[in-house]
Amino acid sequence: MFITFEGIEGTGKTTQIKKLTAFLEESGHNVDVTLEPGGSRIGKELRKILLNMDSTDITGECELFLYLADRAQHVGQVIKPAVEAGKIIISDRFADSTIVYQGYGRGLDPKLLRELNDVAVSGNWPDLTILLDIDPEIGLKRAMTRNLQENKMQEEGRFEAESLEFHNRVREGYLTWAALNNDRIVVVNADQTPDEIFKEIKAKVVERIKGDFVTNG
């Protein structure tokens, strides 16, 4: 089973992935956790380019193809083998990020981005996507605080440095994309306590796992 987490900066994806991983492992599941960009050896090198503040001159098209390259390697080297081995694999971001950030955020064609991602993922779309939704002003404050505390602003702060207008477009893009793919994407209000958020996530994941067991078992 393949689960992804999506959302603008500062929604608390990392915290919720840790909670979900612990819950699933305690329930007897074999779980792998990964992320984009950077889930493979090659991806780690691409991540340095994509998130670094020195890359502010990168064009939208260049950014797109670097993300697609990262994803193709990630799927082939990490995600597909884990799914085939019967594991639950959880990824912090996946193809929806590219469709939303580069499409709704940068103004590229979402339909074209979907088609390009179809090539990159080679049929390995998530079984379930958790979209953590929050007001961009709140999310950006959280993300900036985190990067400053962890001294990662230079290395990984390029998207946090984007305008509030950009992040508003991304948020609206996520909600639009979720509505178009509501069989797979569930929206969870991230402006709650971590435990309240996880309660909702756990219910959605358990429901999907039971459905997957009935279908395949």
UniProtKB/Swiss-Prot annotation:
Its EC number is 2.7.4.9. It catalyses: dTMP + ATP = dTDP + ADP. Keywords: ATP-binding, Kinase, Nucleotide biosynthesis, Nucleotide-binding, Transferase. ATP binds at residues 7-14. GO terms for cellular component: cytosol. Disulfide bonds: none annotated. Pfam families: Thymidylate_kin. Gene3D superfamilies: P-loop containing nucleotide triphosphate hydrolases. InterPro entries: P-loop_NTPase, Thymidylate_kin-like_dom, Thymidylate_kin_CS, Thymidylate_kinase. GO terms for biological process: dTDP biosynthetic process; dTTP biosynthetic process; dUDP biosynthetic process. It comes from the Bacteria. GO terms for molecular function: ATP binding; dTMP kinase activity. Belongs to the thymidylate kinase family. HAMAP family: Thymidylate_kinase (MF_00165). Phosphorylation of dTMP to form dTDP in both de novo and salvage pathways of dTTP synthesis. This is Thymidylate kinase.
